[in-house]
Regions:
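A structural motif detector for short, solvent-exposed N-terminal "entry" segments of globular domains
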Residues: 42-80
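C-terminal motif of bacterial Sec signal peptides marking the signal peptidase cleavage site
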Residues: 38-40
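Short, low-complexity intrinsically disordered segments enriched in A/P/G/S/L with frequent Arg
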Residues: 16, 25-28
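Basic polycationic patches enriched in arginine
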Residues: 11-12, 22-24
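Electropositive
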Residues: 69, 73-105
């Protein structure tokens, strides 16, 4: 079988060579388009917000560029502090927001294994204690909390709102549905989360000496 040839600029060019060149150019263009698409999908890390959780106070403070903008009541573990698997304890130290789940879902939406069950639970429903409304999944950044992501340590909504301010969880940080929705909408992936066994006044810049506002207006009420 004789190969077809073409003449370009006085040179003898084999047809198969032209086809191969076109395929390589097409592949390169496809690769560039794919890289551009993937780059557009990357969510910038949230370096603006900082969440500080005080186990001592059972409160969560949200800072925007180191300025306090909100304080919410929370519940940490009834079993105390720690990070070993199966301990049901709340880890200490520096963590970050790894994933956010449940955006747009109505308050009280029940999640099991981070998947909606289709059930809704009202606040303080008798005998019910599922994960509801929003999930903010945390990843540890230090040896003392290296297991946090694998242990499914979340900031999440709880129907047991009457117990907020008390350590009653199984390791996660619980919030009311309304509060976790607000937090979810403000913080992004990669935002710093610090969990401490100390009062907020010792760790929030300026809170102790009054340069930060110690009480934040939230939904018509003050959170102290």
């Amino acid at each position: 079988m004789t190969k077809k040839t073409k003449y370009a600029g006085g040179r003898r060019v084999v047809g198969a060579q032209i086809l191969g060149t076109r395929q390589r150019v097409s592949l390169q263009l496809t690769s560039l388009a794919l890289l551009s698409f993937l780059a557009s999908c990357v969510t910038p890390k949230d370096v603006q917000h900082h969440v500080i959780i005080s186990v001592k106070d059972q409160k969560l403070a949200l800072l925007d560029r180191e300025t306090l903008i909100a304080i919410y009541p929370v519940s940490t573990s009834k079993y105390g502090l720690g990070d070993w698997r199966g301990s049901f304890r709340t880890p200490l130290g520096e963590l970050e927001i790894a994933q956010k789940i449940g955006g747009g879902m109505p308050p009280g939406t029940v999640f099991k294994d981070r998947i909606r069950t289709g059930e809704m639970v009202l606040p303080n429903a008798a005998g019910r204690d599922p994960i509801v409304t929003r999930i903010i999944w945390l990843r540890g950044r230090e040896p003392q909390n290296a297991n946090a992501f694998g242990r499914d340590i979340y900031i999440h909504g709880t129907p047991e709102e009457r117990n907020l301010g008390l350590p009653v969880s199984y390791g996660c940080v619980r919030m009311s549905s309304n509060d976790v929705i607000k937090l979810y909408e403000m913080v992004g992936l990669g935002a710093q989360v610090t969990i401490v066994d100390a009062p907020l006044v010792e760790v929030v810049p300026g809170l102790a000496n009054g340069t930060q506002v110690a009480s934040i207006r939230r939904g018509g009420t003050f959170v102290h």
